Regions:
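Small-residue-rich hydrophobic transmembrane alpha-helices
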Residues: 45-104, 108, 141-160, 273-337, ...
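Small-residue hotspots at the loop-to-helix junctions and early N-terminal turns
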Residues: 42-53, 127, 131, 194, ...
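Helix-terminus/linker motif at the lipid-water interface of multi-pass membrane proteins
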Residues: 27-46, 114-121, 177-188, 250-283, ...
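Transmembrane helical elements of multi-pass membrane transporters/channels
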Residues: 14-33, 133, 137, 144, ...
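Transmembrane alpha-helix boundary and packing residues in multipass membrane permease domains
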Residues: 19, 23, 34-35, 52, ...
């Protein structure tokens, strides 16, 4: 067992490291939005919490479906059937377009979800505006997720990581300008975050597409070799594999995120406290998620190479390692809960509301690790 762990863990870390950095860069968008809006007003922070819970549920559910490309492309890569990967990517883009239409429709008419929150008219108006703005970035996000799946499948996550880090550095000045105003622009508060995110989503998509078009490594896949109309058989295969993934993502995320809609009934302070804790919980989730994505990549490549025994060994090594890491993280969160909360610099009332929830964040780390790692092993 120890020999197996010593063999498999370095491979996991080499893949999961760039994934984790990239995921944290993306999640830092949310941390940054929360921290910067918290300094603007409690109403805007509450609007961000309500709108964010709706957006993340839609986004994660839909991107979960297109993530089915990763194990398919991973098995083709492991089997050295490189020329078939390009067609799968093209069909993935068609699927992303169809799903984007659904997602944009939901985000553009969010009133049915926001009615659950029973928030004040001011908070609801800002939440609606946030969602209608960020809907413009969803098609780019969906297309980008197809390219992320491709890079994960062929063990090239670092390229996406660099794009995500670049986006983070662009997000900081955009957020400051759009949230607080300046240079003849009025302060926008929470909706300003949405505009910044939309700009970066489109920049990411165009940059990733250009890298695939120009990079010599990708030429063997033939992604841009020809135009492919929608193939109902391939689309159905992708959707059939991806729908359970998207549904599992949706259930997991909404069980936590949609709580914001119910907590909104308790008032702005309670909702703002929940937003901070939910935000921190999302950041912590990136560690088991990155390790699990790396596991899925190695498992799918091993299966494609007709090495089922190796796939099983990698799966067990990852399950043990990921769970151990997350137990340690849970303990650290509980011990350092006050310094972690102080990073958000919330008002005293919000701080008191948030601190009581830290025990739950620390406690569920072990179950999160077991669940997400097992799920990605099965998807591989």
């Amino acid at each position: 067992m120890l020999a197996r762990l010593r063999r498999d863990i370095p491979k996991l870390i080499s893949l999961a490291g760039p994934l984790l950095i990239g995921q944290l860069a993306v999640i830092t968008f949310g941390v940054m939005d929360t921290a910067m809006v918290a300094r603007y007003s409690a109403d805007d922070l509450a609007a961000l919490a309500v709108a964010g819970s709706v957006f993340i549920s839609v986004y994660v559910g839909l991107t979960g479906v297109v993530s089915a490309l990763a194990p398919i492309a991973g098995q083709l890569f492991g089997a050295k059937r490189y020329n078939e990967i390009g067609e799968e990517v093209r069909q993935g883009w068609w699927l992303s377009i169809a799903l984007s239409i659904v997602g944009v429709g939901i985000l553009s008419h969010p009133e049915i979800f926001l009615s659950i929150a029973k928030a004040s008219p001011e908070v609801e108006a800002k939440a609606v505006l946030y969602l209608k703005i960020i809907a413009w970035g969803l098609p780019a996000s969906m297309a980008m997720r197809v390219m992320v799946a491709l890079h994960n499948a062929v063990s090239k996550p670092a390229i996406i990581t660099w794009l995500q880090i670049s986006g983070l550095f662009l997000k900081i000045p955009l957020n400051a300008w759009l949230i607080y105003g300046g240079l003849s622009l009025d302060a926008m508060g929470a909706p300003g975050c949405a505009i910044a995110t939309v700009i970066i989503n489109w920049a990411w998509m165009l940059s990733a597409g250009l890298i695939i078009y120009r990079g010599s490594f990708y030429q063997i896949f033939g992604v841009y070799d020809k135009f492919s109309p929608p193939d109902t058989h391939k689309l159905w295969t992708l959707f059939k594999l991806g729908a359970p993934i998207g549904l599992s993502y949706l259930i997991e995320v909404t069980s936590f995120a949609f709580m914001a809609l119910f907590i909104a009934r308790l008032g702005t302070i309670a909702l703002a406290g929940h937003q901070i804790v939910a935000n921190l919980g999302t950041v912590l989730y990136m560690l088991p998620l990155s390790l699990s994505i790396a596991t899925s990549t190695l498992v799918s490549q091993s299966i494609g190479a007709d090495k089922p025994t190796l796939a099983k060994e990698v799966a067990w090594s990852s399950l043990i390692f990921t769970t151990g890491i997350c137990v340690t993280v849970g303990l650290i969160v509980w011990i350092f809960k006050y310094p972690l909360l102080d990073l958000y610099a919330p008002p005293e009332g919000v701080k008191e509301s948030a601190i009581t929830l830290f025990l739950f964040i620390a406690f569920y780390q072990i179950f999160d690790a077991l669940q997400v790692c097992s799920a990605f092993i099965l998807r591989g």
